[in-house]
Amino acid sequence: TGVPVDLPKTHAPRMEMEQEKLLLTITKEQKVYLGETEVPYDRLEAALTTNTRLQTERELYLQADETVPYGFVAKIMALVRKGGIEKLGLVTDPTGSE
């Protein structure tokens, strides 16, 4: 669920994402969403550190549109780590043929 994006395609077998875990989404416009809520880039670290659920679970899934530059995704991942998240799962589309 969450904000719709075109995920990168992979040949990896499908792994089930835990439905109750929070999802961080990066759209092709490089907008960032925590769950269904848009979070400005300059407020992301604060949003992560003040989210009680994330600070308890310390786990988050990241999905990014396949057109988002790698450097931008890397910056978001660094902010996630600074925000105290210890486990970050990357969501892809396992049906890819590339």
Language model features by range: what are they?
Residues 1-98:
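Long, low-hydrophobicity, acidic/polar, solvent-exposed interaction domains
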